[in-house]
Amino acid sequence: MTDSPATAKIAVAAATYWVDRPFDYRIPPALADKVVPGVRVVVPFGGGNRRTEGIVLSLGTAQSGMRLKSIASVLDASPVLSPEMIRLAVWLRERYFCTVYDAVHAMLPAGLWYQMESVYTLCAGFDRESAYAAAGKSAQEQLVLD
């Protein structure tokens, strides 16, 4: 018999109120000592596996046969939320019609939040003039080249 993988229940930033619930994610062995309740993590979310920020609410083990996505990375060296703050966020969701993540967002300092952005660069040795010609009049493709 194999041990069940360690999991974390995570409130994700991308969830709306109607689908706001803790989502289960597998904890990779490399992150096992870093994933604790109250830390912020980056996880794949939705059908397109878009990376989004989440907050670990609790830890557990997976039921046999469950297919889970894995936590991509941990953003904090130590928890930014205490157990009391996590309970408060869950209570705020029920009382004030907001997501757990929105409640957490309101409790923590503004400079703490993580924002992802896509950065594109040309490969080394790529001819810039032929790239401009291939891009044509597309404003987005021209923006990537500039």
Task: Give the ranges of each region predicted by the language model.
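Accessory, non-ATPase domains that flank or precede helicase/AAA+ motor cores in DNA-metabolism machines
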Residues: M1-D146
